[in-house]
């Protein structure tokens, strides 16, 4: 029958039974030998354990460099988003032809982008002369007037002149009134009488009864010039 050997006490037990082993392990001598054994192992291997821990920390420090030891001019390693996956190793590609735009991370708010600018001309399918966003031309207004200032004219029309006066359409009847204060012109619809030595308008006479002419005002002579009023005339 094999015997049980106690490594702490360095002795063989008389019987290899559970009752004998329990009685030996609870003895005073066995407990003292166990404490001394572990104390001896700790004193001998304390320095080796310290060296192994130091070397393991040094190996981890080489894999992940200290941010304080980064040389000047170098970029620090990118950090991941909080509570999400780490960023790609080559960074986020910029949007455009070189790389597609990446969607925002989950849980992040949408960035406020500026709204698109409205088109300068009317949309496709709008009638000619329509304003921006397909507004119709107001009634009784020339087509050129519907175009707002600063925008391109509709197809088939000329841009307005720089002075600001629109060009009348081909079927526009009548002309523009003369500029006020122009020399040699009177009010609209008034034809001045010819001066002395000048012939009257074609088809009209100089007298009051001439067809197509105008009668001179009271007190005006036949030559077109009137004398002084009776109260201011010279005494003869």
From Swiss-Prot:
The reply to whether RNA-binding figures as a keyword in the UniProt entry is yes
> What does UniProt give as GO cellular component?
commitment complex; U1 snRNP; U2-type prespliceosome
Per UniProt, the Matrin-type Zn-finger stretches lie at 4-36
Q: Where is this region: Disordered?
A: 80-236
Question: Subunit info?
Answer: U1 snRNP is composed of the 7 core Sm proteins B/B', D1, D2, D3, E, F and G that assemble in a heptameric protein ring on the Sm site of the small nuclear RNA to form the core snRNP, and at least 3 U1 snRNP-specific proteins U1-70K, U1-A and U1-C. U1-C interacts with U1 snRNA and the 5' splice-site region of the pre-mRNA.
Belongs to which family?
A: Belongs to the U1 small nuclear ribonucleoprotein C family.
Task: Give the matching PANTHER family.
Answer: U1 SMALL NUCLEAR RIBONUCLEOPROTEIN C (PTHR31148:SF1)
Question: What name does UniProt use for this protein?
Answer: U1 small nuclear ribonucleoprotein C
């Amino acid at each position: 029958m094999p015997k049980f050997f106690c490594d702490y006490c360095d002795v063989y037990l008389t019987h290899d039974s559970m009752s004998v082993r329990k009685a030996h392990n609870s003895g005073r001598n066995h407990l003292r030998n166990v404490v001394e054994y572990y104390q001896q192992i700790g004193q001998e291997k304390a320095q080796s354990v310290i060296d192994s821990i130091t070397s393991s920390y040094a190996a981890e420090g080489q894999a992940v460099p200290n941010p304080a030891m980064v040389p000047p001019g170098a970029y620090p390693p990118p950090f991941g988003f909080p509570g999400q996956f780490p960023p790609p190793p080559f960074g986020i590609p910029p949007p455009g032809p070189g790389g597609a735009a990446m969607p925002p991370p989950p849980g992040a708010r949408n960035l406020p982008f500026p709204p698109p600018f409205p088109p300068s001309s009317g949309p496709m399918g709008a009638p000619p002369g329509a304003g921006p966003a397909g507004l119709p031309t107001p009634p009784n207004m020339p087509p050129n007037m519907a175009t707002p200032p600063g925008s391109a004219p509709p197809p088939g029309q000329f841009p307005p002149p720089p002075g600001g006066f629109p060009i009348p359409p081909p079927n526009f009847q009548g002309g523009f009134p003369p500029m006020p204060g122009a020399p040699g012109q009177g009010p609209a619809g008034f034809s001045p009488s010819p001066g002395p030595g000048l012939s009257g308008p074609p088809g009209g006479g100089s007298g009051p009864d001439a067809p197509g002419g105008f009668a001179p005002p009271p007190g005006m002579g036949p030559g077109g010039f009137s004398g002084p009023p009776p109260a201011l005339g010279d005494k003869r």
